[in-house]
C-alpha cells in the first residue's frame, strides 16, 4: 500500500509541475501576443481584420490562462486532500517532503492569481 501511495505521489507531483508549466507557457505566450497586437496596431499597412484577429488570439490566450489557474487550483485541492487522507503513511521520505514543498511553492505562486 505504501508503494502505491508513493507512486501516486510521484504521479501527482509530476502532474502539478506540468500544470504549472502550462500556466507559465500561456503567460509567456500572452506577452508575445500583446507585443504582436501592439505591432499590428502600429503598422499602417496591416488590415483591420489582421488586428482584430490578433486581438482575438490574445483573448483566447487570456481565457486559457484563467482555465489553467482553475485547473491548478482544483488539482491543489485534490492533492492536499490526498495527502491528508494518506498522512498516516508519511514516513518522512523524500517523496513526501517533495509533495509538501511543491504544494507550498505552487500555492504561494497562485494565491494572487
Curated annotation (Swiss-Prot):
Listed GO CC annotations: cytoplasm; microtubule; microtubule cytoskeleton
Xref: Gene3D superfamilies: 1.20.58.90
A GO BP annotation: tubulin complex assembly
Cellular compartments annotated: Cytoplasm, Cytoskeleton
GO molecular function: beta-tubulin binding; tubulin binding
Keywords: Chaperone, Cytoplasm, Cytoskeleton, Microtubule
Subunit structure and binding partners: Supercomplex made of cofactors A to E. Cofactors A and D function by capturing and stabilizing tubulin in a quasi-native conformation. Cofactor E binds to the cofactor D-tubulin complex; interaction with cofactor C then causes the release of tubulin polypeptides that are committed to the native state.
Function, in words: Tubulin-folding protein; involved in the early step of the tubulin folding pathway.
Similarity comment text for this entry: Belongs to the TBCA family.
Protein name in the entry: Tubulin-specific chaperone A
